[in-house]
Amino acid sequence: MARSRLLNLEDQFTFYASYHTNKVNVLIHVFCVPTILFTALVLTHAIPGAAESLARFQLPLPLLGEVPVDVTVPLLYAVANAAYFVLLEPVAGLLYAPILLTFGHLSNVLYATHHDEAMKFAGIAFVASWIAQFVGHGKFEGRAPALLDSLLQSLVLAVFFVWLEVLFYLGYRPALFKRLQNRTGVAVAEYRREQAEKKRARGAKAE
């Protein structure tokens, strides 16, 4: 059951989207979540052994020719994420896979060629992006981030779901988008009902 839920796009997206209904908060996440992922990949190189190349191969690319690629822990993490996202939603996952793999490769390149500057700016951008997201939730969404309820959502799936938000905005799979909107609306209404009941219960106890 747990495994099937992990691969159920509608269940996972509905949970995520119910925490992100405010347009300003959504926009903040569209920019900040990929930034957090990329900078985290850069910063991961500081873990002993993470920057070590486990293998190297030449990747032929149009216009760029043969590009040397080092297989490192950050790159493997990007590959694992890409594979998971393809299982969740094949087309959107395949469209996003090149971006994820580029993130992994560029994190290797930046760490190897601009070590001090890369770590400094990655650290600043990482912290600033998290702060921006907490502001988005506190000031605009009015609800604590999903980080407090689901680490999987916050640390793995968020980057794919902001990608889906962009695709839906561009007209991707409108029937799926409508279905997810309806499910999210139900989830948000249920959350607000529960919050109202808790508030009434607290008020009754105070009397």
Give the ranges of each region predicted by the language model.
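Core segments of transmembrane alpha-helices
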Residues: 32-40, 77, 96-104, 157-158
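Transmembrane alpha-helical segments that form the membrane-embedded catalytic/substrate-channel core
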Residues: 81-91, 105, 109, 125-142, ...
